[in-house]
Every structure is written in C-alpha cells, then in structure tokens.
Amino acid sequence: MPEPSSKPVLVTCGLPYANGKAHIGHLRTYVPADIYARSLRKEGRDVTFVCGSDTHGTPIVVNAEELGITPKELVEVYHKHFDETFKQLGVYFDAFGTTDDPENHNRTLDIVNRLIEKGYVYPKTIEIAYCPKCNRFLPDRYVEGSCPHCGEIARGDECDQGCGKHLEPGELLNPVCTICGGPAEYRQQEHFFFKLSEFSDYLMDYLSNDLGGTINARNYALGWVKQGLTDWCITRNLEWGVKFPGHDDLVVYVWVDAPIGYIAFTEEWAAKAGDSWEKFWKNDGEIVHFIGGDITYHHCIFWPAMLKGADYSVPTAVVASGMVKIEDKKFSKSRGNVVWVGEDYLSHGFHPDLLRYYLASYTSHTKELNFSWRVLQEKINTELVSVLGNFLYRTMLFAFKNYGEVPSGELEPEVREEIEKALKEVKAAMAEYEFKKAVDSAMSLASFGNTYFQSHEPWNLIKQDKAACGQVLYNCLHLAKALCLIFEPVTPGSMETAWKELGQEGDLHTTLYADALVPLKAGTKLAKPKILFTKLEDDRIEEMEEIANQRVKAADAKKAAGKGNGKEPTKAEGMGPAEEAKPAEKAGGAAKPREEEKETLPMIEYEDFAKLDIRVGKVLLAEPVKKSKKLIRIEVDIGEEKTRQLVAGLSSYYAPEELVGKSVIVLANLKPAKLCGVKSNGMMLAADDGGEIVSALMPDKEIKPGSRIR
C-alpha cells in the first residue's frame, strides 16, 4: 500500500443543530469521525479534529419563541448538552465552538464580502412568503406548502418529505403560515443571490477528479450538477444570525454561515494551540468532512463553490454515512422510533465503548444502519465478550497469577506476521472509510490469539516447563498489547484499562500503531486484570425494548388524540443528522392542529380482520417471571384441550393475584415468542392512554372461555 501522506489533515463533523437532544442517528457521523481521527494519529499524522453547534436558522427562532426564551439562551442549553455527551462517548474535539461565536461572524463576513467583491453575489427582487395575519415575512421553516417538483408537502427551503430538492424562496405552491395556520401570500422584496450556476463546470471537474471520500457523496452531487444548477438565495428575513453586509434587516442563510463554522473552529483551535489555520484553508492541507447522507448537496455543491469563489481551499474528501433505522423501522421522533443517547443509553449504565463498537462494526459506513437492542446484545456478547474480552482477560489473568510480570520470551514469526497483517488491513480499511472492515480485521487478530492460547494449553504446559510456558505467555501478552493499540480508536476507554494492566508506559492514545511490533520488556509488572466486557443479559435488553415500545405507544396515542401533526420529522436547517423541528406555535399558546394533518391508520378489508383469532380467556394462574420486573406468566383457558401460556408486561399495573379468575381478551394466533426465556403463545390485549393508565380488556358480562370476538 502507498505511504501515508505527510500533509496535515483536518477532520470535521457535520454540526449538530442546537435545537434538541442527541440521539443514535447523530452518532453515525461523530463516532466514525472520531475513530478515523484517532487512527490517523496512530499512523503519525498531524491531525486536527473540529466541530461545533449549528446555532442559527428558523427552527431555533421558532422553538425559542415557543419556550419564551431568546435563541441564544436556547442554543446555550443544547450546545452544552452536545459537548458533554460527546465527551461521555469518548469523542474529543480539538475545538467545539458555535456558529454564533465572534470568529464565525467575522469569517462569514470576510467570505461574503469577498464573494461580493468578485461579482459572485447580486441583488434580485423576488417573491417572499408573507403572512398578512401575523404581519411578517415567512422564511424557510415558517412556511409550508406543496413542492413544485413532486407535489409533496414541503417547507420553504427544502422538499424534505418528497424529492429532497432545495427550494428557493417563492417556489412553494399554496403557502401556509406555520405560525397561525392561515394562508400566506407572496410579496416582493430584494434579496441577494450567489452565482452558483457559474461554478457548474468547475464542480463537474472537481467532483469527477479531485474530491475523495465515499462514492455515494460524489455520485449524488454529480447527478445534481448534470441536471443544471440555479443561483442560490443566501439571505433571509430574520434577526437571529449573521447580518448580511449593509442590510441589518437581513441575515445570511444558515447554509452559508454554518459550514464556514469549520473554518472558524479551526481558527479557535489555532489560537489556543499556537498553530496555523491557514495550513488547511489557504494551503494544501487535507480537509475531510464527515456528514450525514442527507446533507450531501450542501457539502458537495454549495460549499466548495463558495470556497472556490472566495479563494479558500476546498474539501479533499466528503464521507457521507447511510441513514439509521430503529428496530428496522424508519427513524422518526414523532412516531417514537428514536433512541436517545443520554436517557436511553448512558443513563442505563451501558458503556460508551459498546455503542462505539456497534456503530463501527454493524455495516459499511455508506449503508443503512439498523439499531436494535437485540442485535447490540448479540454483537457484544459474541464478539467483544467472547472473542476480544475473552482473550485479553484469560491471557492477562493467567500471566498475572503465574508470573506477576511479563515473562522472558521472543516474538514468534507466526505471531509477528498476524500482527503485521492486521495492521496493514486496518490501515487500508480506515483509508477507505470502511470501518467495519477495519474492526473485522482487528477481531480476526483476537480470534487468532484465542486459538494460539488454546492450542498451547498453558495450564498444562506450566506444570511441565515453566520457561516454555513463559514463551507462550510472552507472545500472548504481545498480542494483547497489539490489540490494545489496534482497538483503541474504536473502544478507547476499555483498551486504556487493558494497556495499564499490561504495565505499559506512556499514553495509549498517542502511542503509534508501529509500537505494536516493538518487543515487550520482560519483567514489566502486570496488574490484576478486570473483566473488560460483560454480557448483556436478557432482562436489561427487555427493559430497553419495553421503554421503546412505550415510547411508540405514547406517540401513537398522541396522534390518535389529535396532538401530532401526522408528518415525518423534518431535517432542521443545521448540519448534523436529521433533527425534527417542533410545529410552529403562536407565542403564548399552543397552536391547534389542522384537521387534515391528523394521522389515522390505513383502512383494512374485512378479510384482514378475519385473520385474527381473538377469543375470551379465563386466567387460571398468574405469577411473576423471574429475572424481570415487568413480566407476568399467565395460564389461560381459551376453550382448547390444554391451557395457553402467555407472558404479559403488566407487573407495573396489576398484581398477579388480581388477574386470577378474570376473563380477558386473547389474540390466539400470534406467533409464539420468548420473553426472558419464557414462551408466550399468544397475546393478552390491553389498552393504554399513552400515559400511566393501562387496562386489560375484559368482557362486561360472564361468557365462556373460547368465545370468539367477531
């Protein structure tokens, strides 16, 4: 493989929008970027890793109005939240600023003025959505209507629910004010445009020949350029944001000042580190952007055109991730299909390294990632626990008990070759942003270690020849050292623990990959090892699944009650993975949902209902399920020769003895499922109000078991 570049490299992440909490979808960008930056450092590269909160745009103004606070107060809360969450997950930026920092205001004005001076920005009178009732112009998120391209419901600047195209002010059909729900009209006003169309030829060449990264980003962007580019309105009618030069009534569009944040945050880092930001943005340093796939257009078209026009360096690579599903369902906060990083994962005591491993090893970075608590359990138990953790613990415990230090020995050629092979494969995979391949290669080395340990049977060898056993343990401990270095980018906290137990000097996080082949020093004192990874038990996973189920039920109940808008969450104007903006509400009170937006389930044919075997059952026995705080095992008579065993999550609402003798409603032909190891042959039906009330369904008259519901 070619020698790595000696150029300094800047790694950035799409900015999280300071308008809501961190969820699993966010981490598809930030964790792989952190892994990549750590890996580059282990190759000896000069790496700077920056990010920050995206703090401007209409969604923040809307939400601040709803909460009765200023936009600045709102973003301060969420900026702190993201900063703390990233650190808890082991994601450490060299600078983590905000787009409202003075550095970003100054850099944005510098670039915009430069574009004006070079003739790339011009004024144009256009039609802007205006609400006569609210007496205000309606930029972006303040207006909704029909997309002129596909007819789907869209917001003012993007068809986020349909074709995904960027929309210019005035393009939206049948505009409606999202503040009051009334019809909007178009009025003329002067705004400013960037001559994006003049960069078509440049972008075609840049995307085809110069831009690295993932092929999905390049191909999407090339497709848009081939369709033809139109000039881009870069001003908005807002008070919150970076003021457009010479026009205090206008701010620059959030997609202008947000990516410029990359430069501003580099400046902030340089000022603290006594280094140069220009080595990236004015010279030939490498710039690698990690983004969610839904913001490819902005990073591969708008952004490089602006940079080229203002005489700044353009990105070297854009790495776009695939989307995220939750339990095989489309990610949707409004539908409850979401996993919150804080309240769902970290607050329940799950180690950050487990989630980092899952995100890196589940699938290729460009493919869709499904987050499932069961798959998490399987991957952690069968891979981290049974392979990597097993090898490290058994090796270090045996060595500690029998030697107390690194025994004398030499690195065997076979072991050296396996380490060299793993290093080569990991570096190559990282260079291609194939994090799963890198993890698979690293795990193969751990598997080799287990095989090596097992085949030499040190527990027998030590009884016959302690020196020969020491040679085996020396090689096992050297493999452990190599694994600490190779896995550090993925599971940094756990590997740091193992590194210290091996008695290694120096900071694991700054030690290079090359050190994996430096011989261990015999006589180095070992510490008693800890179990690095423990199995995720069924009851913990079932608890999380129940939390997820209750969230979905609550969302369904909210919509059924007419409190939801029935729409998929929209991509906020920020740069991070999809953020849902709250429906606009009039200051001082909640807006009433429009009737046409209430969601109902689709109509079904009678034949669909007839497929359900729903019967009355009599509860004969009910008892708690061991290892679960929520489940009850129920024996029920439903008119068959034998009783049915059901498992119901009702412990929080009924004592088992309360159910005995009751007539209940049972779905009898539901496929069997195991819960906490207990088989459930059907489902006992219950109702909930989306809050704290849950009620088992029971007939109001005595009726024999087995009676069918028709």
UniProtKB/Swiss-Prot annotation:
Binds 1 zinc ion per subunit. PROSITE patterns: TRBD. It catalyses: tRNA(Met) + L-methionine + ATP = L-methionyl-tRNA(Met) + AMP + diphosphate. Its cofactor is Zn(2+). A motif ('HIGH' region) lies at residues 16-26. GO terms for cellular component: aminoacyl-tRNA synthetase multienzyme complex; cytosol. Residues 608-710 form the tRNA-binding domain. Zn(2+) binds at residues 147, 150, 159, 163. InterPro entries: Anticodon_Met (IPR041872), Met-tRNA-synth_bsu_C (IPR004495), Met-tRNA_ligase_1 (IPR023458), Met-tRNA_synth (IPR014758), Methionyl/Leucyl_tRNA_Synth (IPR015413), MetRS_core (IPR033911), MetRS_Zn (IPR029038), NA-bd_OB-fold (IPR012340). One of its GO terms (biological process) is methionyl-tRNA aminoacylation. It is an enzyme of class 6 (ligase). Its EC number is 6.1.1.10. Homodimer. Belongs to the class-I aminoacyl-tRNA synthetase family. MetG type 1 subfamily. Is required not only for elongation of protein synthesis but also for the initiation of all mRNA translation through initiator tRNA(fMet) aminoacylation. PANTHER family: METHIONINE--TRNA LIGASE (PTHR45765), METHIONINE--TRNA LIGASE, CYTOPLASMIC (PTHR45765:SF1). This is Methionine--tRNA ligase. It comes from Methanosarcina barkeri (strain Fusaro / DSM 804). The lineage of its organism: Archaea, Methanobacteriati, Methanobacteriota, Stenosarchaea group, Methanomicrobia. The gene is metG.
